């Protein structure tokens, strides 16, 4: 049962009690109760004789008891209201308040059975895009589709609208305040790097002094660099990216291996740079795009578990072992009281059968099966069995409609079409709006 449901039930019980106890809700007031009758004013009772000398005394006693009864009723009323406030208001805060403190939601929050934030539709919204890629120094040239000559901007004007709840609109200054002193870490492949770039550009729109944002090592953004960290010095937080396309550790060539084996992937060993991740306040993982034959078997890379070379292991089976290794590391290393962990599901591409890339002008009316992914299902299964809470950013289905959002031929190399990566601004901005909702749906203390 959600907090909202429990709160509503409590309200009904409280109001039911008030209907009995409060003079406003009852035609028979406290003065007609047995206690009130016994100590009623002598004027209201016929004693069959003349008033006794103690009449004034009885009047005083009657008046005193009436006052006490009224006072008791009022106190009870206030206690009930106070209890209802303490119980209900925090729940309402979670249900109706977006991370910017505005009344944004008309239904349940993420995680409640009444609302799946990933079940919805794309709707046109002229408030988008959230930033200009040409004005953000952290967008790779290859992802700036408008800057690379894309002739229309309709693909920028779409917002994700869940069917039964609302994603809060991005309020940059509120988010900057909430991130003060934090460390946000993305770990994964180039899709993770794209989301990292998107978040930085979104956050920079709230700063007048853009020079206060810089890469901590003075590095330019490249595809192969293992670490990139951008510091927002005026708010004392960093947004970091660690390149770990498989999450597990690449292995060296074994001398006794068959000739076709050029390298291995150690499925039971997490990437050696994992010690850099564990102290983050927010950890966002992904892996999937490299788990294909072209990145593995066709390059001579095969799987290894312990000292055993698994030449016959399928890619899905290996992916599952790697996820279990990641999950064990999370459970043994990450402090859930400090670190919030999230895992983003597989991002669908929109290549045709002949590996041609036809980027559409508008979102596709149908997912054509791209809303399903064996990798995404494995992620959900593994996370479900973990002892530490992990949130899933289930972007697979919602992104499957966005055949209009890919880089296509509008990259830094127009000779190579790209229906895997996403334009910036674009779809990754929506992922980040949902990410921020997951992180900050609790009211600020």
UniProtKB/Swiss-Prot annotation:
The organism of origin for this protein: Arabidopsis thaliana
Recorded GO MF terms: O-acetyltransferase activity
A Pfam family it matches: PC-Esterase
Motif DCXHWCLPGXXDXWN motif in this chain: 418-432
Keyword list, A-Z: Membrane, Signal-anchor, Transmembrane, Transmembrane helix
GO CC terms in record: membrane
UniProt similarity note: Belongs to the PC-esterase family. TBL subfamily.
Protein name according to UniProt: Protein trichome berefringence-like 7
Purpose: May act as a bridging protein that binds pectin and other cell wall polysaccharides. Probably involved in maintaining esterification of pectins. May be involved in the specific O-acetylation of cell wall polymers.
Main location (coarse class): membrane
Record membrane topology: Single-pass type II membrane protein
């Amino acid at each position: 049962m959600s907090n909202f449901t429990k709160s509503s039930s409590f309200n009904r019980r409280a109001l039911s009690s008030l209907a009995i106890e409060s003079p406003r809700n009852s035609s028979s007031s406290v003065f007609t109760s047995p206690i009130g009758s016994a100590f009623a004013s002598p004027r209201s009772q016929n004693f069959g004789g003349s008033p006794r000398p103690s009449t004034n005394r009885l009047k005083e006693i009657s008046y005193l008891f009436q006052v006490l009864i009224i006072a008791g009723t009022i106190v009870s009323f206030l206690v009930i209201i106070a209890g209802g406030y303490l119980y209900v208001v925090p729940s309402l805060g979670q249900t109706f308040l977006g991370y910017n403190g505005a009344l944004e939601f008309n239904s349940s929050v993420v995680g409640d059975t009444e609302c799946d934030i990933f079940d919805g539709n794309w709707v046109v919204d002229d408030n988008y895009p959230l930033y200009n890629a040409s004005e953000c120094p952290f967008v790779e040239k290859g992802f700036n589709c408008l800057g690379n000559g894309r002739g229309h901007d309709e693909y920028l004007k779409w917002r994700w609208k869940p069917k039964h709840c609302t994603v809060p609109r991005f309020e940059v200054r509120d988010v900057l305040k909430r991130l003060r002193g934090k460390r946000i870490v993305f770990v994964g492949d180039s899709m993770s790097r794209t989301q990292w770039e998107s978040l930085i550009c979104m956050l920079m729109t709230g700063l007048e002094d853009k020079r206060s944002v810089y890469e901590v090592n003075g590095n330019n953004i490249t595809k192969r660099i293992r670490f990139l960290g951008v510091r927002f010095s005026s708010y004392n937080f960093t947004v970091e990216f660690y390149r770990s396309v498989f999450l597990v550790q690449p292995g060296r060539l074994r001398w006794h291996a068959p000739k076709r084996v050029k390298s291995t992937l150690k499925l039971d060993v997490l990437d050696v740079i994992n010690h850099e991740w564990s102290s983050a306040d927010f950890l966002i993982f992904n892996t999937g795009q490299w788990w294909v034959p072209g990145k593995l078997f066709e390059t001579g890379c095969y799987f290894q578990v312990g000292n055993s070379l698994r030449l016959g292991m399928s890619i899905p089976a290996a992916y599952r072992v790697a996820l279990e290794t990641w999950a064990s590391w999370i459970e043994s290393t990450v402090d859930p009281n400090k670190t919030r962990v999230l895992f983003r599901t597989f991002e669908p591409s929109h290549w045709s059968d002949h590996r041609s890339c036809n980027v559409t002008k508008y979102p596709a009316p149908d997912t054509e099966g791209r809303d399903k992914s064996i990798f995404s299902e494995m992620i959900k299964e593994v996370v479900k069995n973990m002892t530490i809470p992990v949130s899933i950013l289930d972007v697979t289905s919602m992104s499957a409609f966005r055949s209009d959002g890919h880089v296509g031929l509008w990259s830094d190399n127009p000779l190579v079409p790209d229906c895997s990566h996403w334009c910036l601004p674009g779809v990754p901005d929506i992922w980040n709006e949902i990410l921020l909702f997951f992180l900050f749906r609790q009211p600020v203390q």
